[in-house]
Amino acid sequence: MAKVHILDHPLIQHKLSLIRDENTGSKDFRELVEEVSMLMAYEVTRDFPLQDVEVKTPVATMTAKAIAGRKVGLIPILRAGLGMVDGMLRLIPTAKVGHVGLYRDPETLKPVEYYCKLPTDVEERDLIVIDPMLATGGSATAAITFLKDRGAKSIKLMCLIAAPEGIKEVQNYHDDVDIFVAAVDDYLNDHGYIIPGLGDAGDRLFGTK
């Protein structure tokens, strides 16, 4: 069974509280999501292997450490996942960015795909699927299935907050995908919203309703 990693660093938790606050406007919301995403990326990449490299400093030559040739792909689930990309690219600037467009049918709460653009070599990359909310788990599960169908072998899922129902859904279908979250909330309401949650992440990021 894949692991659920709850990233409880004080900076992440402090900024997450500001993100949740209904009085936080779109500009601050975007900046906070970017900052938390960058901090979370630090933990998501913790298991990247290192290799020895020779480095010449101004005073001596030494053996230093460098990431051992990992090719990373960031896969935001549109549209809210876009708000997390820039923060992660600040730490992993060489990552390729693909996009999976899914929306949740308001009647069935099931994901519907409407767009996909991926790096051509997904099978060679460590992919990180990013979406602020893991609610029903339908969109994340569909996106991961979509990536596996195209040859992806290494996938992680990173979300700001998750509902227990969403975690269970992903684990039921993809027990090889580790899940990284800043918080696990209480439950989903009848409309599929995480409680207490943070509202609609896409609307708050982009100032829409």
UniProtKB/Swiss-Prot annotation:
Sorted UniProt keywords: Allosteric enzyme, Glycosyltransferase, GTP-binding, Magnesium, Nucleotide-binding, Transferase
Pfam families linked to this entry: UPRTase
Superkingdom as given in the UniProt entry: Bacteria
Classification via CDD domains: PRTases_typeI
Enzyme class: transferase
Pathway: Pyrimidine metabolism; UMP biosynthesis via salvage pathway; UMP from uracil: step 1/1
UniProt cofactor note: Binds 1 Mg(2+) ion per subunit. The magnesium is bound as Mg-PRPP.
Xref: SUPFAM superfamilies: PRTase-like
GO terms for MF: GTP binding; magnesium ion binding; uracil phosphoribosyltransferase activity
Binding site for 5-phospho-alpha-D-ribose 1-diphosphate: R79, R104, D131, P132, M133, L134, A135, T136, G137, G138, S139, D200
Cofactor(s) annotated in UniProt: Mg(2+)
GO annotation terms (biological process): UMP salvage; uracil salvage
Residues that coordinate or bind uracil: I194, G199, D200, A201
Known regulation of activity: Allosterically activated by GTP.
Cysteine-cysteine disulfides: none
Family, as annotated: Belongs to the UPRTase family.
Described function: Catalyzes the conversion of uracil and 5-phospho-alpha-D-ribose 1-diphosphate (PRPP) to UMP and diphosphate.
Name of protein: Uracil phosphoribosyltransferase
Organism of origin: Desulfitobacterium hafniense (strain Y51)
